[in-house]
Amino acid sequence: MSDILNLNKTYKQQPLLFGDNLGIYDSIHINQDVFNLHKRAVAQLWQADEFSFSSCQSEFAEDNDGTSLMLETLKWQWTADSAACNLYTLLQPFITNDALTQLILFNTYIETVHSETYSEIVKNGFKNPVQVINSISSDNEVITRLSKTLDAFTELRDLGVKYSQNLLKKEDCYK
């Protein structure tokens, strides 16, 4: 059949990773712990524009250590969460459990909301937000701090591509 929708799947409790390809969504044989994590996460749902960040503009206009620290924190969080927006795409080749799919998709969505929120803070809190976003790629502290995460994400992506093409067995994916 298809690798996209496994219509020949045997419906039973599935391992979270490296099991049968996903088929018809199965909430009958659900991993209750993972499903409960998803329910708890959904209960905390919020939106990037729930708060007006325009009041931050006067605070960020001040030239002091607190403002500099906040800017560095914003740049780091914004960049890290932007990378985390790729979480589902990176894990998808390995996921074989519907509850885990649902949880990781929601978590990926939340990382997108986080990224959007940091973008909104910069857009509304800084006089020149384009300058802030452009400064990230040359901020050695942010890039150095994120490099191990990006290396791990790149390795995970490469493993996922090879695993999807049956060039690796599941045992080859563990390190």
Protein language model annotation of sequence segments:
Residues 2-175:
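Non-heme di-metal
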